[in-house]
Amino acid sequence: MAYVDTNTLISYYFDEEKLHEISVRIFNVLRAMRKKIYISSLTLVELYSAIARNLSRYRLPPHYMVLDEERKIHALVKDILEHLKPILVDDEPKLELFDKSSVFHIYKKTINYVATLKLRSLDLLHITYAIEFAKRGLVDMFVTLDKELINRKQVLESLGLKVMDFS
């Protein structure tokens, strides 16, 4: 069971991505290991965002040409999800107290990793989701193409998250 971040999904699906070949190798290994793929709601938001920002550079099949931009984006995300069949894990709509305010549980957990990991906020959120999914027995590894995350492999593994490294 593997938590796969957005850049790996995008790189796999689109031939134009510079890390396409590596991501194909990653998914071949995951299939050979019979690993289920897990994603978070953050991954879903990032998929939409990444496709919207890069839509003009992707070579799309002819049947996409009749769609307006918004429908193309939705269709591509749907196609990625249908093709890779990741399991989207529900968010816990739990609130926690933080400095006299209520914040979502996942954000509070993320704040706890800030000093240790020193990553960008979305990367921190992905890591937190993966750690939380691991605690629930859903995943046992984190898959990324992000060098900054791979460079923190030892720290992540000390937090209980095995990192798949294909660099």
What is the predicted function of each stretch?
Residues 49-62, 84-89, 128-134:
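Short regulatory "switch" loops immediately downstream of catalytic or recognition motifs
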Residues 4, 38-39, 121-124, 144:
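Short beta-strand scaffold positions
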Residues 1-72, 165-167:
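Short, well-structured N-terminal submotif of metal-dependent ribonuclease cores
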Residues 15, 75-117, 124-128:
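Acidic catalytic patch
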Residues 8, 43, 126, 148-149:
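Alpha-helix capping/helix-boundary segments
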